[in-house]
Amino acid sequence: HNGIIENHAALREDLDVEFASETDSEVAAHLLAREVSAGADLVSAMRAVVTRLEGAFTLVAVDAADPDRIVAARRNSPLVVGIGDGEYFLASDVAAFIEHTRDAMELGQDQVVELTRDGVVVTNFDATPADTRRFHVDWDLSAAQKQGYDWFMRKEIFEQPRAVADTLLGRTNELGEIVLDEIRISPEELRSINKIVIVACGTAFYAGLVAKYAIEHWTRVPCEVELASEFRYRDPIIDPTTLVVTISQSGETADTLMAIRHAREQHAKVVAICNTNGATIPRESDAVIYTHAGPEIGVASTKGFTTQLIACYLLGLYLAQVRGTKYADEIGGVLKELERMPEELQELLDAQENVLNLAAELKDEPSILFLGRHVGYPVALEGALKLKELAYIHAEGFAAGELKHGPIALISEGLPMFVVVPPYSRDQLRDKVISNIAEVRARGARTIVLAEANDADARAHADHFIELPRVSTLLQPLPAIVPLQLFACEVA
């Protein structure tokens, strides 16, 4: 079982059995056993059980009395069937069986699959025949292997220059205009948009926070950013003039998928930013921008974040181009800077020794804080998330301007604090952040400062200095996140 059965407590009360655990998985197992004991075959039993379950889940079952049959079902949770030579595989992602077969079948919503020696049969929960989509995986097998790295995550951190370049590839025409072939929304419809709502979870949510700054600056359209888990359970104000942008690496994030369905019920246009071709989220959206990052095996997203930023920047620039809110030379200038980004990221990765040494010094710290302002604030949040996810160290990200409204009380002697300093191009922001650094340092914090190499003021207030390349303010999250990813990975 993968996922969450939301009504498992109520179902548990209906079962007159002794439970060995508190898991929702055991509830599903007992329900299946009861149906089979009553004479149902495993397929019928599975259909009877899943119609009673609420939530997002995938179930796979085998009957000990009939071991040559595997039955699985999915609702709001991914499930793919690998089709090999005389063999079949079940997994949530093709990366699990790519070394055995590249041919696969993706199950749709509320479907049951039966695997036997004779083949694969897919039906809907109501027992009617189901439509399925077969596809061939064409990415390199090495993408699902560590290739000498100790972790998939470390490998994926070092794949970011290529992933960013691939996401940018083919996005402009011979005139230098942005071309997003996947956007199946007419220019007239895009010009009628009067509000943008970005919906995402986790790391993708932080990418959305960065996108808000860029999109509002370039398009002058109000932009909101919402957690999908909150958006779907309230009554958001959206209508046909709202553009909903969803961000999901897998394309199967349950809360984000539910948010899309809610938005479409309100007749809003939906654009998905996704890394997985043919996943549920892009299929249910009006348009999609694929990030072309390649498979992300590591649970903690790295290249997913940077390529999502690239896709968000491209969308913002495309909207500015269509709506005429930025001149062509301004858009072209940003595009040229983005095209240089793979080289900038590679230089950061080549200079990793500085970050690795810092990780060795701080690996036993019980708590680490992250501070940022403007687009540096989402970078601080993402840096803290990476450390929590990987090293299980308490970490928090704060907006620098909120320092006096509570976070300053957490500062004690020797507390490590990462600070992202804005570029010289935003002097007012930069000066305020440097003032924040001086303030926390005066209270005993150990400051790890990320700033442009030639920023002598920032360097003067740093106990440890991490050099960033010189980029425009809105694009700074791309290089700034890389040292924080490396740090979290090495500490873990």
Feature names for model-found ranges:
Residues 1-151, 155, 159-194, 346-349, ...:
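Conserved short alpha-helical segments that host acidic/polar catalytic motifs at enzyme active sites
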Residues 4-6, 64-67, 77-79, 85-88, ...:
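Short, glycine-/Ser/Thr-/acidic-enriched flexible segments
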Residues 160-164, 168-197, 277, 287-419, ...:
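Active-site phosphate/pyrophosphate-binding segments
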Residues 127, 146, 153, 446, ...:
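Generic C-terminus detector
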Residues 1-6, 72-81, 149-153, 163-164, ...:
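Conserved phosphate/anionic-ligand binding catalytic regions in large, soluble enzymes, centered on
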Residues 53-87, 358, 363-391, 420-423, ...:
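Acidic/histidine-rich
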